[in-house]
Swiss-Prot record:
Record field: compositional bias (Low complexity): 23-38
Free-text note regarding domains: The GRAS domain is involved in DNA-binding.
Biotechnology comment: Potentially useful for engineering drought- and salt-tolerant trees.
Motif interval(s): VHIID: 326-330
Annotated stretches, region: SAW: 512-588
Primary location class: nucleus
Compartment annotation: Nucleus
Protein known as: SCARECROW-LIKE protein 7
Length: 588
């Protein structure tokens, strides 16, 4: 079966578009009236890790836009208006001659054979050692970059996923028998009624200081969850009884509140059991293909990664507008999909193509203990794509452990304009002390970058008490689950897999036992403190960057409950129903 290519983060899809547009120009020059050629099964890369899946019910989702001529030809530069380079939108008042564009991949674009792609993904040349992951997840962790995610946006860090197991106690047998008996596929009866609009944010949810202390007493079920979380810390037997009752009021096939509650019950059980339930089938009976398709489905349904990469790339593009040599240090690269759109923008900028573009890639933790093969495959894909754009491009894998990195590892040349990218990766270094994050930031500062881009999840789950962490996580993930409903129906198997394999695992990491394996995140105020204490000052995002982020939400027909909020000193936040989800900023 062939899947329609609908993802502008997909290098193969962009390559098809690039070649098709070049051919259109040649046909126009020759005044040819032959029908536009379509490229079927084109794959200029030796390994294509970016899948496309069947389109969701909304035809405008993913990276495709409706209409064959939605945007101008990215290879046709107009006069220099003096405006910042950026995405060129045909429906904006001012055109920008060089920058990012939304190509149309929903029209008569290329198709490719999904079986052939799956073989190359699962049996390709970038396998890594992820022995500290559950065995069923090994292949997935080696190929976890989708759409324009730098890595799994809801990935549980490999170093934090598993907990050593001791022989099961009587308490854990009770919990396992009472709470973890998942219904078989035959027992699941999805609701047939259409999904309802997510309820508005409760009136009495408040934010106190920088730690987002949230009151969730408006809903009896949410209140019961908070009370159960209190019991988990002191009265375990009562907590177990409470969890048994809560299990009756939640469902992985219900409304967003019921579904998020289902995974919070599981997370609380893991905490009560002190890691002894890690072998439950919900956490290990998965295949790499299931993970792969889940990431693709999430990226098609929600704008998380599109927003983060679009905004960061725009800041880099503006900071390097007239640079002839550009060097990007990418902390936490997986498969480099973020850079496809940037390379295309640099190839068409009004100031002309750069003389050289170089990316130094520091592997993300998700690549495991031996990331060399994955980085090599990433570099080869980007090199092949740069050749299509006629760009002089270099990729340098950085295999030095992050704690040992110094300025000499990057060979920064005096005539290079340097950009440093931290995209949904620094949170992996968070701990009870900020030492690891500060070390990475100060090392980046020593490189004297022109611009530093930072993208992080907007929720405080680090140095706060367990109850506050629980409340913050409940509010955050309730919003995430609600955001899936407009484009994923209640009976959608894609939605079930996204929540079970991606979000449920992350919730478990947040609520589970404390220690180095626990998932940690911080809000923008804490990131501001960390950035400023490391010597960085904020750089305001341009009006154009903010405008194009708004147009991104509009053009892809996402729910009107998505919103953008710009706040001091220079943050741009994507929110769902007024609950912040992701924040992007730039620094120098």
């Amino acid at each position: 079966m062939a899947y329609m290519c609908a993802d502008s983060g997909n290098l193969m899809a962009i390559a098809q578009q690039v070649i098709k547009q070049k051919q259109q120009q040649e046909q126009q020059q020759q005044q040819s009236h032959h029908p536009q050629q379509q490229f079927l099964g084109l794959n200029p890369f030796s390994l294509n890790p970016w899948p496309s899946t069947t389109m969701s019910a909304n035809p405008n989702l993913g990276y495709g836009l409706s209409g064959p001529a939605a945007f101008s030809d990215p290879f046709q530069s107009g006069p220099d208006t003096g405006d910042p380079p950026g995405f060129s939108f045909s429906n904006m008042e001012h055109q920008h001659s060089g920058g990012f564009r939304f190509p149309d991949f929903t029209g008569a674009g290329g198709e490719f054979d999904s079986d052939e792609w799956m073989d190359s993904l699962m049996n390709g040349g970038d396998s890594t050692d992820s022995s500290n992951l559950p065995s069923g997840c090994d292949a997935w962790q080696n190929n976890a970059d989708f759409g324009i995610y730098p890595s799994d946006p809801f990935n549980t860090s490999p170093s934090r996923l598993t907990v050593g197991c001791s022989p099961p106690s009587d308490l854990n047998r009770v919990i396992s028998d009472s709470l973890w008996a998942d219904p078989s596929p035959q027992e699941i009866k999805p609701k047939t009624s259409p999904p309802q609009q997510p309820p508005p944010t409760a009136k009495n949810e408040v934010v106190v200081g920088s730690k987002e202390v949230v009151e969730l007493s408006s809903s009896p079920v949410l209140k019961a969850f908070v009370e159960c979380a209190q019991l988990v810390e002191s009265k375990v037997d009562q907590a177990v009884k409470s969890l048994i009752k809560l299990k009756e009021s939640v469902s992985e096939n219900g409304d967003p509140g019921e579904r998020v509650g289902f995974y919070f019950v599981q997370g609380l059980c893991r905490r009560v059991a002190v890691g002894e339930l890690d072998d439950l089938k919900n956490f290990h009976q998965t295949t790499s293909e299931e993970f792969t398709l889940s990431y693709k489905a999430l990226n098609d349904a929600c704008p998380y990664s599109k927003f983060a990469h679009l905004t960061a790339n725009q800041a880099i593009l503006e900071a390097t507008e007239k640079a002839s040599k550009i060097h990007i240090v990418d902390f936490g690269i997986v498969q480099g999909i973020q850079w496809a759109a940037l390379l295309q923008a640099l190839a068409t900028r009004s100031a002309g193509k750069p003389v050289r573009i170089r990316i130094s890639g520091i592997p993300a933790p998700v690549l495991g203990k031996n990331p060399a093969a994955s980085l090599l495959a990433t570099g080869n894909r980007l090199l092949d794509f740069a050749k299509l754009l006629d760009l002089n491009f270099e990729f340098e894998p950085i295999l030095t452990p992050i704690q040992e990195l110094n300025e000499s590892c990057f060979r920064v040349e005096p005539d290079e304009v340097l950009a440093v990218n931290f995209m949904l990766q620094l949170y992996n270094l968070l701990g009870e002390t900020p030492g690891a994050v500060e070390t990475a930031l100060k090392m980046a500062k020593s490189l004297n970058p022109r611009i530093v881009t930072l993208g992080e999840y907007e929720v405080s789950l680090n140095r706060v008490g367990y109850l506050t962490r629980f409340k913050n996580a409940l509010r955050y993930y309730t919003a995430v689950f609600e955001s899936l409903d407009p484009n994923m129906s209640r009976d959608s198997q894609e939605r079930l897999q996204v929540e079970r394999l991606l979000l449920g695992r992350r919730i478990s990491g947040v609520l589970g036992p404390d220690g180095i394996r626990r998932e940690r995140m911080e809000n923008k105020e804490q990131w501001r403190v960390l950035m400023e204490s490391s010597g960085f000052e904020s750089v305001s995002l341009s009006h154009y960057a903010m405008s194009q982020a708004k147009i991104l939400l509009w053009n892809y027909n996402y729910s009107t409950l998505y919103s953008l909020d710009d706040s001091q000193p220079a943050f741009l936040t994507l929110a769902w129903n007024e609950v912040p989800l992701l924040t992007v900023s730039s620094w120098r």
